Amino acid sequence: MLSDPIADMLTRIRNATRTHKETVDVPASNFKEQLANLLVAEGYVAGVERTRLDGQPADVLRLTLKYGAKREQVIKHIERISRPGRRAYVSAENLPRIQRGMGVAVVSTSKGLLPDREARKLGVGGEVICVLW
């Protein structure tokens, strides 16, 4: 049993990008699917597909990873911020700027999962799920 499925998903993505895998499979949930779709919209992942593998009882999210022209990693750093043991909530004014605006902080708000720029624009704070650049 996993105590933090979001951290597991981020670790799988981190490990797959470091070994230059084309795809990575993670156990599916609605929250993870929203997070994966946000990564696609921000340009860090090429695609996401919800599927069921042969003989598996549960759905799986298959993320197609993205690399640069010379196979350099698009995701250079990915880190879980708010954990089950220590939640991290911030107001709209205190949303972190990641790598001087070149990175993304993923924030869970009352309007759904949003990148930090969008949350700042809408004036909503929330729980900082992870940061990446």
Swiss-Prot record:
Alphabetic keyword roster: Ribonucleoprotein, Ribosomal protein, RNA-binding, rRNA-binding
Molecular function as annotated in GO: rRNA binding; structural constituent of ribosome
Gene3D superfamilies: 3.30.1370.30, 3.30.1490.10
Record-linked PROSITE patterns: RIBOSOMAL_S8 (PS00053)
Tree of life domain: Bacteria
InterPro entries: Ribosomal_uS8, Ribosomal_uS8_CS, Ribosomal_uS8_sf
Single Gene Ontology BP annotation: translation
Family: Belongs to the universal ribosomal protein uS8 family.
Subunit organization: Part of the 30S ribosomal subunit. Contacts proteins S5 and S12.
Function noted in UniProt: One of the primary rRNA binding proteins, it binds directly to 16S rRNA central domain where it helps coordinate assembly of the platform of the 30S subunit.
Annotated protein name in UniProt: Small ribosomal subunit protein uS8
UniProt organism field: Deinococcus deserti (strain DSM 17065 / CIP 109153 / LMG 22923 / VCD115)
Lineage start: Bacteria, Thermotogati, Deinococcota, Deinococci, Deinococcales
